[in-house]
């Protein structure tokens, strides 16, 4: 009887530790459903129906492994990826890494900020510039939560992630995708033409986020409670749950676009405004409004995550710190420039996702090297299988980027 009570008590304690350690992956996962995903997935679904769903599936599985490795690095070493690169690489390489990581973070933030501004424009009927001002104010307010510690921010961002997921459950109900072709698109790889390759690279860039690779290792490096092994096991659950939700949202985005647009003859839907306007007569005003609200939620939460990632990158690589509000103010500027110049915001969103795909390998190569180093990682070092899969992911990413560059230069369609 006594031993049974002890076992129950230890089991409850283990569950408490696991729950206490949940959260960082939800912050990371919000980066996987930013407005760049909306733009890329809608364009892919409208243009090719369900044919590119398999890209989302495989990209999400890759992202799960990558986020586990990133989180594991922080747990095992007490340092984030940027700090490890700074400590182990020559100074010119470190500066190169810092510059490209900042560019990637700014490209990400551009997509996220403009996406939220478009959401405000669609739902409230304001101008895009007014939507950008509302986005700026809202992100400043969310970032103020950081003063109270990491947990309150994790809860707010996790709540926004769940809101977007529920919104897309509703969108799927409205759009009623056909199950047979949807299932075929999930399991049978196909790239019909050059545009499909471009969009596949965009989906990859939108699904595997370089700035979040840096951020996740920072979110776990100061975790306390339980043993190192318990922290790692809790983190794996954290990643599995959060990334499954993010993966579902991405699949739902593309499937909804395919069902609502592609199979109703609207294959040219290529921007978020057009998607909103087309959804209303095809499905309902409620479906269009839910789309707009989910875009706002995704944009606000992901732009906050982008700001945090930029801070981690700067502090980690060059040991330089600026206040979060100042970084937020600086990184808003490109978005306002794009809006004031009247550039196509959705095209900017899709292009930013393609740019992101070029930063994946640069973040992933050192991550694999460090997490495969037994001296650094101890008992959490990568197994041979994980190393093999990791390098295969690098090869896939580099090959897709190479194909994209060659196709662009030669004008292949």
Curated annotation (Swiss-Prot):
Q: Report any one BP term from Gene Ontology.
A: iron ion transmembrane transport
Enumerate the transmembrane spans: 19-39, 46-66, 94-114, 122-142, 156-176, 196-216, 241-261, 290-310, 329-349, 350-370, 389-409
An example of a GO molecular function for this protein is: metal ion binding
Localization recorded for this chain is: Cell inner membrane
Q: Which InterPro entries match?
A: NRAMP_fam
Report how it sits in the membrane: Multi-pass membrane protein
Which cellular component appears as one GO term in the record? plasma membrane
Q: Where is it mainly found? A: membrane
Instruction: Print the keywords alphabetically.
Output: Cell inner membrane, Cell membrane, Ion transport, Membrane, Symport, Transmembrane, Transmembrane helix, Transport
* Record function comment: H(+)-stimulated, divalent metal cation uptake system.
The family classification in the record reads:
Belongs to the NRAMP family.
The protein's name in its UniProt record: Divalent metal cation transporter MntH
